[in-house]
Design a protein with these regions (language model features):
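Bacterial Sec-dependent N-terminal signal peptides
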Residues: 1-21
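Polysaccharide-binding surfaces and accessory modules of carbohydrate-active proteins
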Residues: 22-35, 43-254, 270
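Conserved, mostly hydrophobic/aromatic
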Residues: 30, 153, 279, 323, ...
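Extended acidic/polar, glycine-enriched regions
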Residues: 143-146, 154, 159-163, 245-305
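Flexible, active-site-proximal loop/turn residues at the rims of small-molecule/cofactor binding pockets
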Residues: 174, 288, 359
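Conserved oxyanion/phosphate-binding beta-strand-loop segments in alpha/beta enzyme cores
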Residues: 302-314, 349
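Aromatic-lined carbohydrate-binding/catalytic grooves of carbohydrate-active enzymes
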Residues: 314-362
Length: 362
């Protein structure tokens, strides 16, 4: 009997140690996203930044960053996909009302796999609730050469009746810096893509749209983050992100009580509760981001290289080019000025000339 008890205890300790030592690494040539499983089986982000040269450095990364720092009884960290109704105090990545009406979800690490895909490596992490047959699969594709990471989530369940999703984020990322500067872009007629930079302070900043098919009319689904200082073109640590979704989107930026920033890209949950049937899989849009220590220029070029290579149809093929007179002349043009533009365009090898707003001029 004593031997059986000791064996069970040893097995439990081994299980805990296995969880505690489990490290999941999503890496490009220059960036590491590192996650750890806690002794109780929860998954936490422990690092996102410059790539480690020595793998032994992972052992120094702690998951329980909030322990004894905020007066909480429980140990908490940057949970990779924080849920509503659990011990996390801030904006969740997913919120669900289960079939029995309960609105609490706890996700535990179940498994992870990595496989080679075109241009990179895909990591799939499976999280499950211990009480409900509710599952979230986190997908990350790291493109090593381009230094770009793509992330999305799959949500499913096998409960007795449909569950209601009222938050469903593509991913959740955390950063720790002395200051955070957000640059977003807003638009209006003849004022497209106007940049605006704001220093983030404690609390939430939300960039979103509820215009449906006109989603990008006043807010662009793209942002830049500068760490310690506003994002610059050729220097400084930055992160650029965009969501692959043409409809209502929402970017949430929340600075917590210890100065950590969480970034949550998602479909806008406004008037968008989703009834998920048993066995059905809800797939979120992809979130694509790039980090750089050399400013926005490098990160932007990396995103463009990635998009041409892997996302845009025939992105590496030659493209027809077009010259629109609007940027050159506005409404102030005539036949002679247009003829000069056409000649210059031909000399440059431009394929087509477009006369814009021609009815307003001579």
């Amino acid at each position: 009997m004593k031997k059986s008890i000791m064996l069970i205890a040893a097995m439990c300790m081994t299980s805990v140690m296995t969880f505690a030592q489990k490290v999941i690494r999503v890496s490009t040539d220059k960036t590491d996203l590192v996650m750890k499983v806690s002794p109780k089986g929860r998954l936490y982000q422990v690092y996102l930044g410059d790539k480690f040269l020595n793998p032994a450095d992972y052992d120094n990364l702690k998951w329980d960053v909030y322990a004894a720092s905020d007066g909480a009884v429980c140990q908490r960290g940057h949970e990779v996909y924080a849920t509503s109704g659990a011990e996390d105090f801030f904006e969740p990545a997913v919120a669900v009302t289960h079939a029995d009406g309960n609105m609490t979800t706890y996700l535990y690490y179940k498994s992870s796999v990595q496989k080679a895909v075109e241009g990179g490596t895909e990591t799939v992490i499976t999280l499950q609730d211990k009480v409900y047959p509710f599952t979230v699969k986190l997908h990350y594709v790291a493109y090593a050469k381009e230094n770009v990471i793509k992330a999305w989530s799959e949500i499913s369940h096998n409960e007795k009746s449909p569950v209601t999703l009222w938050r469903y984020s593509s991913t959740m990322l955390y950063f720790k810096s002395s200051k955070y500067y957000l640059t977003n872009y807003h638009s209006d007629w003849a004022k497209e893509g106007q940049p605006e930079t704001t220093q983030l302070s404690t609390g939430k900043k939300i960039i979103d749209t509820k215009l449906g098919t006109r989603a990008a009319m006043q807010a662009e689904p793209f942002f830049e983050l500068g760490f310690d200082e506003p994002a610059k073109e050729n220097e400084g640590k930055v992160m650029l992100g965009t969501i692959g979704w043409p409809g209502n989107f929402r970017f949430t930026f929340e600075v917590d009580n210890v100065g950590a920033l969480r970034v949550i890209p998602a479909i806008n949950p406004y008037a968008s509760d989703y009834k998920l049937k048993a066995g059905e899989v809800f797939t979120t849009p992809e979130f694509i981001f790039a980090m750089s220590d050399n400013g926005m220029g490098e990160a932007s070029r990396n995103l463009h290289d990635w998009a041409r290579q892997y996302q845009v149809n025939m992105g590496m093929d030659d493209r027809l080019t077009l010259l629109n007179n609007w940027e050159n002349t506005g409404f102030d043009f005539n036949q002679q000025s247009l003829a000069e533009l056409m000649k210059d365009a031909k000399d440059l090898g431009v394929d087509m000339f477009l006369l814009d707003d021609g009815w307003f001029a001579k």
